[in-house]
Amino acid sequence: MRAIGIVLAGGNSSRMKELSNKRAIAAMPIAGSFRSIDFTLSNMTNSHIQKVAVFTQYNAKSLNEHLNSSKWWDFGRKQGGLYVFTPTTTPDNSYWYRGTADAIAQNIGFLKSSHEPYVVIASGDGVYKMDYNKVLEYHIAKKADFTVVTTDMNEKDDPSRFGIVSTDMDGRITNFEEKPIQAKGQQVSA
């Protein structure tokens, strides 16, 4: 399936404290030479998504260096390419990204210039393996406007650090609360 990938890699993290003082969470080293963003980019490549935009922002220097120096994901510009975007300050806009929706809005021109019928938006700081084609197949089968991948948190974990999702019997979202002080469920956006 033809889709464009968007990787959100601009956030800072108070829960990572000293580890994120000098680098973006997506640039955190894992198992030596890998960075956390490598998992998301590998998922994109393995799902045959050939055009990927990475939205960076906070402490992005080491992340940008990693993205610019690595050819591991095989995003050749002839097939699509890997594009890195940072917030652009103009006389009309002097803001950093003010969240996920604003990051998309500030880069809407990139999406409009793309011809892929679907967009896969993923976080750059998750360590997981996912076939986005299966998500797209589910999305198309359900004739959904959008699809959110969720997971159930372990009872011992604190879900209030995530977006809490409530769904009906058909899996349709009935409520979403971003990082609530007191979580009312264990199902979180992945």
What are these regions (language model features)?
Residues 1-190:
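Unchanged
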